[in-house]
Amino acid sequence: MLKTNQKNVHAFEIEKQEPEAVMEFLEKNHALLQYFLIIFKYDIESEVKAVLHKHQLLFLETNRALNGRYIKTTEKDANLLKQNSPNAIEPKTTIYERNIRSGEEIYSTNHLIFLGNIHNGAKIISEGSVSVYGVCEGAIVCFGEYLILKEVKSAQIVFQNKILSLKEVERLLVNKNIKIITKNDDILDIKEVL
């Protein structure tokens, strides 16, 4: 009997563009991209493949359309969905009062609240919103409506499929005040709360 495992995968989909831009993106973000499948919607160039192999990134070349959560819904569509499904289940919230250790990985469809620290080498991936009230040194991938961070010492942060740039991460490092990250269209908004 054939032994198989089913896995859910988070992916970055890259459309045809200049190889130099793709290589720059891969070089800059290779540490964070270790956690994703990179899907190229075209036959990639040999120099791009060399960068992918150099950093041991997992990738796929395909011309096939892939289904997924990349579809943008307008506010009108969202309101219509709410009207048509009043009993829609909201994600639950999970609270972690302990520290998340190096090497620990948490994958969740819930909203997550961390009262302790997230150590370097830990990885958090959540379909819901994430709040971290301790020191954050690990990788965070948040697909929720918001991301709340207090003391950040990590450059490995992804919010709604966007890897935070060095400039955005520097805004988080300024002080230990609580900051909330939201997204309006394609623009990240980082606000200091306290």
From Swiss-Prot:
It comes from the Bacteria. The keyword Lyase does not apply. One of its GO terms (biological process) is regulation of cell septum assembly. Belongs to the MinC family. This is Probable septum site-determining protein MinC. Disulfide bonds: none annotated. It holds the Pfam family MinC_C. Keywords: Cell cycle, Cell division, Septation. Interacts with MinD and FtsZ. The gene is minC. InterPro entries: CAP/MinC_C, MinC, MinC_C_sf, Septum_form_inhib_MinC_C. It comes from Helicobacter pylori (strain J99 / ATCC 700824) (Campylobacter pylori J99). Cell division inhibitor that blocks the formation of polar Z ring septums. Rapidly oscillates between the poles of the cell to destabilize FtsZ filaments that have formed before they mature into polar Z rings. Prevents FtsZ polymerization.
